[in-house]
């Protein structure tokens, strides 16, 4: 491992599925994001990029917006006729906003795709993903808590977090909060630092809290501020927990749960278009007053 390297993390997309603004939504946040004078910038869908040397990168979740994300972030752009600094992609679940970008990466470019067996089967069972040339795209199945390296010198593990199967696999009422291969977090260790990426989490458990404690940085599920946010805004009928996402605020919320764990930097990502923390106001002030940061496209963290 190169001890002199920085662990460099770029938030490629800070929004949840649909982005901000969502194509068919006229909520307050989406209307503001369409107005250049509002100060609320549009945000793309959920993804991070990580590097140790600024040359080779791994991407966590392949957003439908990955072409735009590469365009917006110079370190990810090609440096010769046919080239990409993206050496690998790691999937944390099988949601559309984390898979669809794989189709954009189909243009005869080599990279390694890491996922659990359950998420890997979603990819292999869908013939549309055959556009990823198997001679160029190597698919690696990672067991829960198995050590692997998405980049040279970057130690990683996938670990189970409470969640559910993707929406398109639901058959009736899904089991909520189950821990298995369908929803995982990502643990990273390099340069003496320990970082976690958990874009989807249904609830905090004792084992998850113990894992996150004393981390240098945690990028965590910030989908909804309140559990009934989509119902109150008239944009949906489901609670956050029904969708597999613990709310930020309220009993059992992540604001209180993470605040107890002595985490150096706490950063919300995967933020829904309806979430009031996108704009100035009391909700954002409460989050920031507790020492949390609100992720945004292009945000860079160096450790």
Swiss-Prot record:
It holds the Pfam family Lactamase_B_2. Keywords: Plasmid, PQQ biosynthesis, Transport. One of its GO terms (biological process) is pyrroloquinoline quinone biosynthetic process. The keyword Transmembrane helix does not apply. InterPro entries: Metallo-B-lactamas, PQQ_synth_PqqB, RibonucZ/Hydroxyglut_hydro. Pathway: Cofactor biosynthesis; pyrroloquinoline quinone biosynthesis. Belongs to the PqqB family. May be involved in the transport of PQQ or its precursor to the periplasm. This is Coenzyme PQQ synthesis protein B. It comes from Rhizobium meliloti (strain 1021).
């Amino acid at each position: 491992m190169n001890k002199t390297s920085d662990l460099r993390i770029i938030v490629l997309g800070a929004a949840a599925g649909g982005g901000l603004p969502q194509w068919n939504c006229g909520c307050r946040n989406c209307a503001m994001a369409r107005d250049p004078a509002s100060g609320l910038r549009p945000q793309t869908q959920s993804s991070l990029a990580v590097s140790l040397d600024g040359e080779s990168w791994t991407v966590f979740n392949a957003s439908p917006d990955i072409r735009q994300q590469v365009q917006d972030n110079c370190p990810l752009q090609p440096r010769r006729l046919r080239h990409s600094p993206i050496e690998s992609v790691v999937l944390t679940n099988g949601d559309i906003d984390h898979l669809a970008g794989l189709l954009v990466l189909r243009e005869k470019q080599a990279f390694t795709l890491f996922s659990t067996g359950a998420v890997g089967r979603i990819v292999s069972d869908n013939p549309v993903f055959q556009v990823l040339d198997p001679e160029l795209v190597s698919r690696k199945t990672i067991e829960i808590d198995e050590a692997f390296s998405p980049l040279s010198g970057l130690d990683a593990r996938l670990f189970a977090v409470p969640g559910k199967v993707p929406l398109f696999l639901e058959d009736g009422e899904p089991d909520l909060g189950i821990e298995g291969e369908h929803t995982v977090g990502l643990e990273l260790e390099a340069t003496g630092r320990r970082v976690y990426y958990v874009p989807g989490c249904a609830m905090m458990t004792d084992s998850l809290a113990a894992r996150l404690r004393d981390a240098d940085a945690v990028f965590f599920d910030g989908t909804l501020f309140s559990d009934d946010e989509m119902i109150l805004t008239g944009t949906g009928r489901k609670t956050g927990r029904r969708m597999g996402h613990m709310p930020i605020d309220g009993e059992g919320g992540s604001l209180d749960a993470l605040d107890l764990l002595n985490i150096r930097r706490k950063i919300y990502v995967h933020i829904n278009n309806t979430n009031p923390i996108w704009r100035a106001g009391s909700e954002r002030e409460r989050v920031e007053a507790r020492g949390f940061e609100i992720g945004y496209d292009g945000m860079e963290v160096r450790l």
